[in-house]
Amino acid sequence: SITSNTASSGGGVCVGDGTFTMNGGTISGNTVTNCGGGVTITGKSGKFTVSGTLTITGNKEGTTENNVYLTGDKINIGEDGLTQDARIGISTLGGQLQFATGANNDALDYARIFIPEATKQGYVVIRDTDGNLFLTEHQHNWTYALKEGTTDTIIATCDATDCPITDVV
């Protein structure tokens, strides 16, 4: 466990151009004033290899959840892969990006493992056919229908499986 640290960035772990490998374990309860409450990768060639059942949650930038701070494709899922119980909060400088490679286990729900900390802005995790993971804005697929039992109320429902909106509009 890496816990209860305070820093300007990378409260738990700060990596420049090296590689940090984490096979299980926990990084939590760390606080920063800048970015990467749990882990930050600052260098252009820096990488973070993850596998097993690991947890990187509960780290903060001030009072805001900020666990693994990414500026690009920095995470590699190791040969042993992740378990469905792994939880990794992810933050970015802003917007959409590819953040991981090696997500090749079709039995895993990577959107439950990697938790976008920008969910209020509608960001979700998606996987392409090559095993790359992306943090991207959710794309709604709206369907419209009359509300059952009425003739004047239309309901809208997003049919996309990763939709952050759970209420019928």
Predicted regions and their residues:
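Cysteine-rich, disulfide-stabilized extracellular repeat modules
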Residues: 9, 22-23, 35, 52, ...
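Extracellular/surface-exposed low-complexity segments
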Residues: 51-142
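Periodic glycine anchor positions in long extracellular repeat architectures
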Residues: 10-12, 18, 25, 36-38, ...
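Right-handed parallel beta-helix
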Residues: 1-4, 19-31, 49-58, 78-82
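Extracellular beta-strand/beta-solenoid scaffold signature
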Residues: 6-14, 31-42, 62-72
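Thrombospondin type-1
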Residues: 18, 138-169
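A generic structural signal for beta-strand entry/edge sites
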Residues: 36, 47, 65, 130-132, ...
